[in-house]
């Protein structure tokens, strides 16, 4: 399986990489949060742009991105607008969503974008090609905050992302039972062993799914999300605890 290298970080080799999400409403808070995050132990900074209030002003959005880049120049920056339909803070039209991601790509300030699988096949394919032409990696994602589908469906979605040339396919699902967590882990393992030719990220959410955030190296998930301050999704644990557990499992 090929790895994905962003800056000096090799995703898909060794212990799962830790991603943290920064969620700030304006430029002042972006700056203060970035300064607070700078001291934390993590690998990738995700900027959750759907929390940013002034999305109509692209210059303001990119000014905030510039602050993040300058505050943590060594950290890979993942630009994510999580749509309301997949658990994000704001609804957005497909046209505006694509335009925002293209602006981020054009800025030269971001290393990766998050692109939701169910945005529309043509738009997704075109945006992936546009990102790659500008040396920006694509994390292609799908989130279900209500349920966990069957393993076959989980694998089908991840394979579809791979067929669309995502650099890193990602899926996050809500378990209704402990067996749902096992379904996610089994699907991850099957994808990893039989179909994946690139790193994947999977997780089962909420307290029930916490084990999936820790056991990525065992089952085949290349990264996991931790919290510096406020968790961006149910079930996230602190980056300090997360690094400790990931290191223990890696060295065992």
Swiss-Prot record:
Domain of life: Bacteria
Top enzyme category: lyase
EC numbers on record: 4.2.1.10
Pathway: Metabolic intermediate biosynthesis; chorismate biosynthesis; chorismate from D-erythrose 4-phosphate and phosphoenolpyruvate: step 3/7
CDD domains recorded: DHQase_I
Chemical reaction(s) catalysed: 3-dehydroquinate = 3-dehydroshikimate + H2O
GO molecular function ontology, one term from the record: 3-dehydroquinate dehydratase activity
InterPro entries (UniProt xref): 3-dehydroquinate_DH_AS, Aldolase_TIM, DHquinase_I, Type-I_3-dehydroquinase
Biological process per Gene Ontology, one example term: chorismate biosynthetic process
Swiss-Prot/TrEMBL keywords: Amino-acid biosynthesis, Aromatic amino acid biosynthesis, Lyase, Schiff base
Pfam families: DHquinase_I
PROSITE patterns (UniProt xref): DEHYDROQUINASE_I
SUPFAM superfamilies: Aldolase
Active-site residue list: 143 (proton donor/acceptor), 170 (schiff-base intermediate with substrate)
Residues that bind 3-dehydroquinate: 21, 46-48, 82, 213, 232, 236
Job of this protein: Involved in the third step of the chorismate pathway, which leads to the biosynthesis of aromatic amino acids. Catalyzes the cis-dehydration of 3-dehydroquinate (DHQ) and introduces the first double bond of the aromatic ring to yield 3-dehydroshikimate.
Family to which the UniProt record says this protein belongs: Belongs to the type-I 3-dehydroquinase family.
Assembly, per entry: Homodimer.
Cited HAMAP family: AroD
Protein's name in the database: 3-dehydroquinate dehydratase
